[in-house]
C-alpha cells in the first residue's frame, strides 16, 4: 500500500515541500494545503488499519458512539435524582407519607409522574429507579471501557505487525545504494521508531475525537435550554481558541525540533548501543572507552535537551496564562447559576446539571484541542513512514516500448541450469552522492564455465564489480550483458536466483546450523543429506558434529540461552557451505577464506575446483595462491583492470601481478622463518583516478 506522494505535506524534507506563507493572501491556500495534507495522512492510517482488520474500525466506531452518549445520560439521570430527592424530601417534611415506595414498579412511577401525579411515594420510587439506572449506566460504561482497552491492545498488535511487514517488504526491494546514504538510515530509523505505536495511537485518538464531539453537542444542547446560558457556552468555546493555537503551534515546533535534531538522537543511540554491543564490549573495556562514550552521550544529550526544554517551558507558560483567564470566566458563570438556585428559579439538581455541563463543555473543548493536536503531531511523524514507503526503487527491469507484436512487454527470464556469458562493456560506477569513479571503464568478458579471480589491494573496486554483476547496483556508465541481453532487462528476483554468493561481510544468522546452510538456496526443500554434504565440502562437518545438538544446534544467544557462539573461522566455513548448497549457475566468493589459515584455504579452493562442474566461478581474494587455479585473472588498481590473463601468462609478464604474487610469497616465507614480512607496495604507475568534478 503506497502513501501520498513525497512533498505533499508541509514540513517534508523534499524540494517539492510546500513553503510557508509569505503574505496574508497566501494563508488560505496554505491552510487548505495543510488540512488536505493532514487528512491525507489520516486516511492513509485508516487504510493501514482497514487492511489489517476491518473489525478494528467497526468496533472502535461503535465504542466511540456509546462512550459519547453515556456521560450526558448519566449527568441527566444524576440531576433528575437530585431534583426528585429534593421534591420528595420537601413533601415528607410537610407530612406526606412515603411508606410503600419500594412496592411500586419503577416504570409505573415514571408513567404516573409524567401524567402529573407527583405524590411523595411516587417521587421516592422514582429516586430509587434513577439510582438503579445510574448503577446500570456505570456497569455499561465499565464494560465499554474494557472492550475499548481490549480492542486497542489487540488491534494495536495487529497494526504493528502490518506496519513492520510493510517496512520489511519495502526494505526487501530497495536498492542497495539506498543503504549507503545517511538520509536513508534517518528515514528507516524514523519509520521503525514510529511503527510500534503511532498508527493505533492516532486511530484511537481519532475515535476519541468522535466521542468528545458527541459529548460536546449534548452538553451545549443542555445549556442552551436555559435563557442566557448559550452565551456562557459561546464564551467558553471562544476562550478555547488561544489554547488551540498554542497547542498546535508547539506540537509542530516539537515535531520540527525532533526532526531537525535527528542526528543528535542517532548519535545518542549509537553511543548507548556501543556500551551494550556484545561484539564490542571487550574492546570497549580493554581500551577504557566506556567513560569516553558516556561523556559523548551526555554531551550530545545536553545539546539536544537544551532546545527541547525551552520549547516545553514556553508552551506551559502560554497554557498558564490562558487557564487563569478561563477559570475567571467559570467563576462568573457559576455565580449566575447559584444565584438562580437561591432565587428559586432552579433546583439543586439543575445546579448540578448546568455547572457540570458548563465544565464538561470546557473539558470537551480542551480534550478536542489536545487530542486533535496529538493526532496532528502523530500524522506529522507518520510522514516518516510515508517517506520510507515512498523511497524510490531504481533497480527495476528496463522494459522495451510496447508494440503491436508485444503490447505488454514483460521482464526477461534467466535460462537457469546452463552456463552463461557475461560481458562488461565500458562500465564505470560512482556511489550515490559521490563523483569519484570506483570503477572506471571496465570491459571484460566472462565465458561459460570460467574460473575468474579478481585480485588487487583494498579499494581496487573488486567487491563493487561483484555488486554490479549481481545487480545490487546499476552502472553509472556502460552496460553489463548476460547472454547477449542487457542485465537491466531481466526480472530482478529471477536474476538473483542465478547467483550463489558469499560476501566478504557474510551473514551470521541466529538460527540452527542446518538453517544457516539451507539459506544458501531457499527455493530448495531443506534436504538433511544435501546439508551434510555441503558442510563436509566446506570442512564444517568436523566442528558441527562436536556441537551439543549437531546440525540442530541453535547458534548465537539472541533467542536461546544455550545458543552456541562460533569462532569467525567456523562462521566462514558455514558461509562456504551455503555456497556449496546452492544450485546456482554462477558461484561468487568475495574473500571466502579470509579467516582461514592458508592450508584450510587451499583445501576449500581445491573443493570448489572439483565440485563446480561447468559452473562459472568468480573469486575475490587477497591471497594470490588461489589465483593459480583460475582460467582468468583480473588485476585491479583504483577501479581499473590493469592486467588480464592466467597465472602463468601474468607471471611471465612480470608486471603488477608478478610483483604482488612474489611479495606475498616472500611474506609467507618470512612469517614462517620469523622475519619481518614485506608490505605490499603501491603501484607507482597507477595513482588514484578522479573525475574532474569534486574529487574525493
Model-predicted segments: where are they?
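Cytosolic ends of transmembrane helices, especially the final helix of ABC transmembrane type-1 domains
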Residues: 289, 313, 333, 354, ...
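An intracellular "coupling" helix at the cytosolic face of ABC transporter transmembrane type-1 domains
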Residues: 51, 190-202, 256, 260-263, ...
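Short intracellular "coupling" helices and adjacent cytoplasmic loop segments at the cytosolic face
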Residues: 21-30, 166-197, 261-296, 387-401, ...
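Membrane-integrated ABC transporters
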Residues: 1-71, 88-129, 148-152, 169, ...
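Cytoplasmic coupling helices
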Residues: 150-169, 176, 235-279, 295, ...
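Transmembrane helix-loop-helix hairpins at lipid-water interfaces of multipass membrane proteins
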Residues: 57-147, 216-251, 328-335, 339-349, ...
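ABC-type nucleotide-binding domain
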Residues: 403-696
